Amino acid sequence: MPSKKYADYKGAEPYFELVRSALGDLVDGEHFFDVVADNIAYEVRYDLGWPRVIRGRDDLMAQFLGYVGNIRLRSADKLIANRADNSRVVVIEYEVHGTILATGAKYENRFCSIIELENRKIARWRDYMDSLAAWNALTAGAH
């Protein structure tokens, strides 16, 4: 259940819950933003509206506000999680399913994320996604 503290991010809650469950007892905190280090480096390896590297928890939260203003997720699933480097690194593969709010187009996407942990928080995140799936969803109705 989403915390009132993060109610504005409800549109991404399935993603947050999937990530939190993938990390289990490796991190401290209930919500995704609780387990993110204040000085996180969140890198996205695609160019669809986000900066290549987001630095800091506050900036990451601001980016997610933009995300939930454009996309509402209804689910996140097909999680595959692998741990490496004595569980200091977690690699997750997953899918998200939702709606592009401006057009009502279906949004289906696949991701692979490499998560580095320090002091029981997410210190670094490197994200890869199916850019074609995102492009098709975001431009639906424009072609």
Predicted regions and their residues:
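Short, mixed-charge, low-aromatic patches
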Residues: P14-G24, L48-P51, V68-R72, E93-E95
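A beta-strand edge to alpha-helix "cap/lid" segment located at domain peripheries
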Residues: M1-A7, L65-H143
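Residue-level detector of alpha-helix boundaries and kinks
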Residues: K4-A7, E17, R45, G49, ...
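Short, low-complexity N-terminal intrinsically disordered segments enriched in polar/charged residues
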Residues: M1-D38, A142-H143
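A solvent-exposed, acidic/Ser-Thr-rich amphipathic alpha-helical stretch
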Residues: E30-V90
